[in-house]
Design a protein with these regions (language model features):
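Alpha-helical transmembrane segments in multi-pass membrane proteins
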Residues: 4, 8, 12, 17, ...
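Loop-to-transmembrane alpha-helix initiation sites
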Residues: 127, 143-150, 165-176
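C-terminal ends of transmembrane helices
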Residues: 21-25, 96-106, 133-140, 185-189
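Cytosolic, membrane-interface loops and tails of multi-pass inner-membrane proteins
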Residues: 22-54, 189-208
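Short, non-helical or kinked segments that cap or interrupt transmembrane helices
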Residues: 31-42, 102-115, 142-150
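A cytosolic-side transmembrane-helix exit/cap motif
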Residues: 105-109, 130-134, 167-173, 190-196
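Helix-coil boundary and interhelical linker segments in multi-pass alpha-helical membrane proteins
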Residues: 1-7, 69-88, 119-125, 159-172
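Interfacial segments of multi-pass membrane proteins
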Residues: 44-51, 72-75, 92, 96, ...
């Protein structure tokens, strides 16, 4: 079983290393990290390359999260750890996305893949926190605010709904919430100071 856990961890982590924004911009003979905020994430990509091309980024980042959770679940389900397997895959793919060894440990902030793993762990809660993101974004125009509120609430809602059903997925949910909020610490500081930049997620971008 130890080897199975190690295999699940490695698969999920290295899937997380495949950063959609970096890959798609590389296909365009460019690097999203050399533009704007320098972040390898969806928001910076949209600002500079547009919403149309961002669909490929979304497909990659959501796809890798789904694959990681499913692979981990399938590997560990023979041992009776189906839900724990999904949670392990969720944790490792987000760690791979935010701290990718193949990209010098400089990845994205994990919100897109984070919403996806939330859906994989519990689709009802995933949809709810995605709704929180949408409401916050459309009311304020701040992607970061929606990201912090939605990701920050996931772990606590998951713990409340699934309390008593197993500690590992609950711990993973709380860890993911804390990690993604921490990845947005600079955004939180700018929000408090009134310096955060609003983002049009339907923008055509600045680079043609």
């Amino acid at each position: 079983m130890v080897y199975s856990i190690a295999l699940a961890v490695l698969i999920a982590y290295f899937l997380g290393n495949f950063n959609g924004a970096v890959l798609v911009s590389a296909m365009m003979h460019d690097d999203v990290r050399s533009h704007g905020s320098g972040n390898a994430g969806l928001t910076n990509f949209v600002r500079n390359f547009g919403a149309g091309r961002a669909l490929y980024v979304i497909a990659i980042d959501m796809g890798k999260a789904i694959l990681a959770c499913e692979a981990s679940r399938l590997i560990l389900s023979p041992y009776g750890f189906s839900i724990d397997g999904t949670a392990l895959g969720a944790l490792c793919v987000i760690l791979g996305h935010t701290f990718p060894i193949l990209l010098g440990f400089k990845g994205g902030k994990g919100i897109l893949s984070g919403v996806t793993v939330a859906l994989m762990m519990d689709w009802r809660i995933g949809l709810f926190v995605f709704g929180i993101f949408l409401v916050a974004y459309f009311l304020t125009g701040y992607v970061s605010l929606g990201s912090v509120l939605s990701s920050g609430s996931f772990g606590f809602i998951y713990a409340w709904v699934h309390w008593g059903e197993g500690i590992f997925p609950i711990l993973v949910g709380l860890l993911l919430s804390g990690l993604i909020v921490w990845m947005h610490r600079a955004n939180i500081s700018r929000l408090v100071k009134g310096e955060e930049r609003k983002t049009n997620l339907f923008s055509k971008g600045t680079d043609k």
